[in-house]
């Protein structure tokens, strides 16, 4: 893809309105699911779509597997069927600022990349150069939500001959702040080469996450994220825990779409 020049930044008034709307919309956890007592509210009031493995100033080589996250209790909903409130699908903006008109559908071109199947990642194949990237969530009609990322300006130093298709392998993973954490702490979910959706959409080839938190002694806590959520904040009692993340089929109820991912953590 050729190098492109970013357009001028949005005006301050529009940004202020976006932030206020995002804060009003963000809730944690989902209002339609009774949360487990160990679930906690996110420290930040605003919801955002974000990069989980890329930050402003990074220098990368392509092809590069870029991964997405979504906070504030929002969930992924493919465009095949309407999702509930606080749902949408990801968009990657390349050298484009946020739109000033959030009542106009996002265009389809090489600067607005749509992920309408509920994807959580893409492979960048950009040529060497400097780019500004950002994430933006939009609804079934591709109308933007006030859920987006800060811009990340990156430099592609080299484009390799690697086949991009080899970088994305079906599977799930979870990400923690570290092996030792303090409450509340975030658990981020990820699905590679698999699609995430609301259970109620009943779409083939999609799933929803289920997290099982097992203490060193006592009963495990099982949390189902049936509205497409891809992260959770937890505040369990101090101790040692094993976390297991699954992506369950939304049609063949209870059937995993990939082997579970596990991690151990100590809460102090």
Whereabouts are the PLM-identified features?
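Bacterial N-terminal signal peptides that target proteins for export
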Residues: 2-13
